[in-house]
Amino acid sequence: MSATPQPAQLEITGFNWVPDFAKGFVRDLRPRWACEEIGLPYSMRLLNAAAPRPEAYYKEQPWGQVPALVDQDSGLTIFESGAILLHIGEKDERLLPRDPQGRATAISWLFAAYNSVEPMAFELGNIEIFAAGEQWAELRRPSLIEFTCKRLDRLAIAIDGREWLAGQFSIADIAMATVLRDIEGSGLLEERPVLMAYLERAISRPAFKAALAAQLADFRPSPAAAA
């Protein structure tokens, strides 16, 4: 069920334009994917990434980023994609197991994706995209790669023999797969077949494909067109 302009239970914020390298990777993809997995209707409120945010938006998201979520049923406003995934997961056991250990495992891996893996992926993207060619980035890269490889090796050991992190597919896999996509093509995943196979399982799901297509369809061709 793709995003719809009609009123829906959840409203998610996103951008109506980003540079080409960011298309398909903006973090509103995460709650979109979760909604698609369980057929939960959602609508999008698109912001112009090339313009200053409306001042009122900082009350929803203190840094003016996306996504933020408004749950029309409860009236709750939530920011940070991990918190949003947890909120959506609470609505349906297909995304968050109801048995205590399954729930604890899924939540642990949700936090692990964003606290133990994403910081390295984010920094790697920073030095290779935004600081490419700068001396400090070249000096930082070897130690960053070494540390990232250690994290990925431990992740591969943890995933080996499992289909999904918490037994069943869950919000933990949405979190981890979207983080791993950020370093796909760097060679770091390709050197670890267990992680590549895990990522391919995740992004081959129809719900991911629907969420990705919906996000890409929302982008205007240029900042001027998004104004």
Give the label of every model feature segment.
Residues M1-L139:
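GST-like domain detector, emphasizing the conserved glutathione-binding G-site
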Residues A113-S204, A227:
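GST-like fold's C-terminal all-alpha helical module
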Residues P52-E55, R201, F219-P221:
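Short secondary-structure boundary/hinge segments and terminal tails
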Residues A213-A227:
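Terminal-tail/helix-coil boundary detector
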Residues G89, V179-L180, L212:
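Active-site-flanking alpha-helical
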Residues N48, I171, Q215-L216:
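Short, solvent-exposed turn/loop segments enriched in Gly/Ser/Thr/Pro and often Arg
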